[in-house]
Amino acid sequence: MRHYELMVILDPSLDERTVAPSLDTFLNVVRQDGGKIDKVDVWGKRRLAYEILKHSEGIYAVIDISATPATVAELDRQLGLNESVLRTKVLRHNK
């Protein structure tokens, strides 16, 4: 298992209280494949450096994950298919 940090920028029209539960549905992919969610940190609504899909703000969430590369690729694919997700970025930690 490798350690990853996933940053997700969500549509600012979403209610911030529902961000963590909605992300949890995607994170079930990691749990089903034997991975572990170390931390979910919702930063809230922040201004973007440049517009993404005509949005100047986004709701940021940072998630620390321990999983296999295939599991993280599947998670990133599923997040990319969701219309409320503006952008994702996956980084591998060297712990």
From Swiss-Prot:
Q: Which GO terms describe its biological process?
A: translation
Q: Which GO terms describe its cellular component?
A: cytoplasm; ribonucleoprotein complex; ribosome
Keywords in UniProt for this one?
Ribonucleoprotein, Ribosomal protein, RNA-binding, rRNA-binding
One GO molecular-function entry: small ribosomal subunit rRNA binding
Q: Which Gene3D superfamilies match?
A: 3.30.70.60
Q: What does this protein do?
A: Binds together with bS18 to 16S ribosomal RNA.
Q: What does the sequence similarity comment in the record state about its family?
A: Belongs to the bacterial ribosomal protein bS6 family.
Name the chain's protein: Small ribosomal subunit protein bS6
Q: Which gene encodes it?
A: rpsF
